[in-house]
């Protein structure tokens, strides 16, 4: 229950943060013609994952909370579909990188375009842990985009 409350708070913050304007330095970068297609360059922790999901799928991260047997905090049993398998793989990826504190480590990533032409990049300035966690999130978001979302699997 405590973990679910924390996730709800984090997802709520992510919705708020995704609505905030970029800071002045990032706004200046967005004016550069070479970077005009980049919709966001942000340094965040688990909240960054929600931006990747939005870009890759066109859906809010909320749609994936309590979906199937694996989406949300924890998970067990058999994956109910491809989306749920993405969540299971994401959980296992975080587990492989547990020493990096994947739920809280900040990393730098950028998204450009939007669903269905989203591009997600994990920045080269990330250290090993940041790169690994960023890639866990990127792979999961792209996996969500490749699989059919079934609303009846959300509970």
Curated annotation (Swiss-Prot):
Catalytic-site annotation from UniProt: 90, 137
Binding site residues for Ca(2+): 72, 74, 91
Enzyme Commission designation: 3.1.1.4
Gene Ontology terms for molecular function: calcium ion binding; calcium-dependent phospholipase A2 activity; phospholipid binding; toxin activity
Keyword field contains Disulfide bond: yes
Prosegment residue ranges: 20-42
Cofactors required: Ca(2+)
Transmembrane segment boundaries: none
Record's keyword annotation contains Methyltransferase: no
Gene Ontology cellular component terms for the protein in this record: extracellular region; nematocyst
CDD domains: PLA2c (cd00125)
Further details from the record: Lacks hemolytic activity on bovine red blood cells as well as neurotoxic activities.
The protein, known as: Phospholipase A2 A2-actitoxin-Ucs2a
Source organism of the structure: Urticina crassicornis
């Amino acid at each position: 229950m405590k973990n679910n409350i924390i996730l709800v708070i984090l997802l709520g913050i992510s919705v708020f943060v995704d609505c905030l304007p970029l800071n002045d330095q990032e706004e200046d970068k967005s004016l550069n013609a070479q970077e005009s297609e980049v919709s966001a360059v942000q340094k965040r922790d688990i909240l960054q994952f929600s931006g990747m999901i939005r870009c890759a799928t066109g859906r809010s991260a909320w749609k994936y909370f309590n979906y199937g047997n694996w989406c949300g905090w924890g998970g067990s049993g058999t994956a109910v579909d491809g989306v749920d398998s993405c969540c299971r793989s994401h959980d296992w990826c975080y587990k492989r990188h547990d020493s990096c504190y994947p739920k809280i480590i900040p990393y730098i990533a950028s998204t450009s375009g939007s669903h269905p032409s989203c591009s997600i990049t994990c920045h080269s300035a990330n250290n090993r842990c940041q790169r690994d966690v960023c890639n866990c999130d990127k792979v999961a978001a792209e996996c969500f985009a490749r699989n059919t979302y079934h609303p009846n699997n959300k509970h």
